[in-house]
Amino acid sequence: MRFIHLSDLHIGRQLHQYNLKEDQEHILGEVVDYARMLKPDAIVIAGDVYDKSVPSAEAVGIFDCFLTELSALKPEIPILIISGNHDSAQRLDYASGILGQKGIYIAGKLPQNQEEFLKKVTLQDEYGEVDFYLLPFLKPGYVRTVFDGEMPESYSKAVQM
């Protein structure tokens, strides 16, 4: 499978009072152009979509426009998105149910207990099915609440649990 992998978009970021809106819109437009040209099997956005956990309306609009342009491409390209440490898991997860029906799969929130599972997305190529388990950003303290007080020593140990 071929992917376009993006991370750390930090949409809405300002650099020393300089608004990066035009730069961000330009580079996201370039991504749309590359997706149109390369026709990947999926686009993976691995966290830090926004620069702040409560993004500005402008930042949300930029990301909305980006997803709208990507979702209009033919053939359709599935989009897999996970939240990062700068994102609000709940805000990023908003409308994920209906977006998933349109091929935009978002995992903002983590499972709240051991009975819940990570969001699984199954894609297919000429070799068969491929399963993706969307694991959003997690803090070691999260593991303690789900695994009855167990406390991992590091982020990597938390993910392994």
Model-derived segments and spans:
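Short, charged helix-to-loop "capping" segments that act as catalytic/coupling loops
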Residues: 70-79, 113-114
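N-terminal active-site segment of His-dependent metallophosphoesterases
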Residues: 1-68, 75-76
